[in-house]
């Protein structure tokens, strides 16, 4: 389980992007129903207000609309109800989703590009899109 840096959402390959919806939804439902998450890579979400996870979902859903021209209205309602009036933010998980975390995400995505097999592999074109996105976000070329 992993939450990609919210800044990478517009640049993720379709496979990684669509998989992110399953991750966000599973995290929200575990937190809501079990009052906890149980995965090393995402447990930090609980250090933030629930509104940050809802904000992440809303940023995801905007990008989803840009890509596929539809939205997740029922799921959006579920997220808003989950956050129970917490404030939303345009930069969710501030302090965690920083440049260092962005680089960790890029390294993980590079591994999927370089070592990936079959459908899970990130193609050269998809990798270039991620590198271009990294440069847009940071103003720097991505270096491994």
Language model features with spans:
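Sequence termini and other peripheral, non-core segments
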Residues: 1-144
């Amino acid at each position: 389980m992993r939450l990609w840096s919210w800044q990478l959402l517009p640049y993720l390959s379709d496979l990684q992007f669509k998989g992110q919806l399953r991750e966000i939804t599973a995290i929200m439902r575990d937190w809501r129903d079990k009052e906890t998450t149980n995965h090393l890579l995402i447990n930090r979400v609980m250090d933030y207000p629930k509104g940050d996870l809802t904000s992440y979902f809303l940023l995801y859903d905007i990008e989803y609309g840009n890509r596929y021209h539809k939205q997740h209205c029922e799921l959006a309602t579920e997220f808003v109800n989950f956050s129970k009036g917490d404030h939303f933010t345009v930069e969710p998980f501030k302090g965690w989703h920083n440049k260092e975390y962005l680089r960790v995400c890029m390294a993980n995505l590079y591994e999927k590009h370089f070592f990936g097999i079959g459908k899970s592999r990130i193609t050269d074109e998809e990798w270039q899109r991620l590198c271009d996105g990294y440069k847009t976000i940071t103003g720097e070329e991505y270096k491994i």
